[in-house]
Amino acid sequence: MIERRPFAGLGGANHGWLKAKHHFSFAGYYDPERMGWGNLRVWNDDEIAPKAGFPPHPHADMEIITYVRDGAITHKDSMGNTGRTEAGDVQVMSAGSGVRHSEYNQEDETTRIFQIWIQPATRGGSPSWGAKPFPKAERSGRFVTLASGFAGDDALPIRANARVMGATIKAGERVTLSLDPKRHAYLVPATGIVDVGSIRIEARDGAAITDLSTVQIAGIEDAEVVLVDAA
């Protein structure tokens, strides 16, 4: 099963400094049919104005992955971590028993991110944060694991039964991905257009995938795609 979730039909909010679209219920957007996909709870598509951002606020018991599409995001937290994550790179925060953090666009241009929340395998534990560059050339024509709850993956660690993956797919190129049909995959092109199986998925649309052992993704335009493989 592959279900297209068009960008135009997503929930969202415009706060002036923040233009947000929500693939799943979040804040003031509630849809009982879109409370998550497996243990994937949140996928927000955020545009953050220059010199603006999220002031310090708390989180607990959530794995929070930030994929930077354009610009850069600067993170500070109550553990003493500070980091600037640029376009194409990824940061992960395991909120654990509780943490406060802020995220600001300190650049002179709009920053665009995907923020993905995944429910952890166990509650509590010490919070942690990390970031890692993932050059787009290294994921050309194939999926690379960006964050993972599985030992042995060369990726940022998360405490969840899930993987976050990324690929760049050129127009005319096809990539085949093996899946567990009992799990839940969710794919979003950051840019470009792809066919997921026979379903056309445009930039910032979502594709909810389950009950399939393989899926073929074909580039219609050059595309940058992010996928979560969730329990």
Language-model segment annotations:
Residues 1-231:
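Jelly-roll (double-stranded beta-helix
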